[in-house]
Amino acid sequence: MSIYHMKVRTITGKDMTLQPFAGKVLMIVNTASKCGFTSQLKQLQELYDTYQQEGLEILGFPCNQFMNQEPGEEADIQEFCETNYGVTFPMFSKVDVNGKNAHPLFVYLTEHAKGMLGTKAIKWNFTKFIVDRNGEIVGRYSPNTNPKELEDDIVKLLEQ
């Protein structure tokens, strides 16, 4: 199964697959509104503003699995992200990224891009996965990695 066949739900409740993003460079991120890394939403939006026309899509998936840092409902999350960080990149409904209820997209991502010491589990909010235009996962980055640090890698993928 390719990543593009994964079923997701937008933050406004629309069911879809990732097929509309085929042929694009993707950065898939588990987000949270009350996290020490929440300010990364600003950098994510800056990357999106700069490179969306060249084929970058940033996909945000709110997650409440880490210290209850995303307790709100989807409408609250969307309003927070838009009001405080000007987020216009696609946001999706809240998901689990680990455990028996983990969303199939994150099961797929963690099976194909392991973390430190070969672990599958996502350790915290704002773990980032980069997917190339062919749907191959080419990188997994920790929450400590600022999105802007990935700009050179993104540009190289966009140029392919």
Curated annotation (Swiss-Prot):
Source organism, top-level taxon: Bacteria
GO molecular function per UniProt: peroxidase activity
EC numbers for this chain: 1.-.-.-
InterPro entries reported for this sequence: Glutathione_peroxidase, GPX_AS, GPX_CS, Thioredoxin-like_sf
GO biological process: cellular response to oxidative stress
SUPFAM superfamilies: Thioredoxin-like
Pfam family, one: GSHPx
UniProt keyword Oxidoreductase, yes or no: yes
UniProt-annotated catalytic positions: C35
Sorted UniProt keywords: Oxidoreductase, Peroxidase
Family the entry assigns: Belongs to the glutathione peroxidase family.
Name recorded for this polypeptide: Glutathione peroxidase homolog BsaA
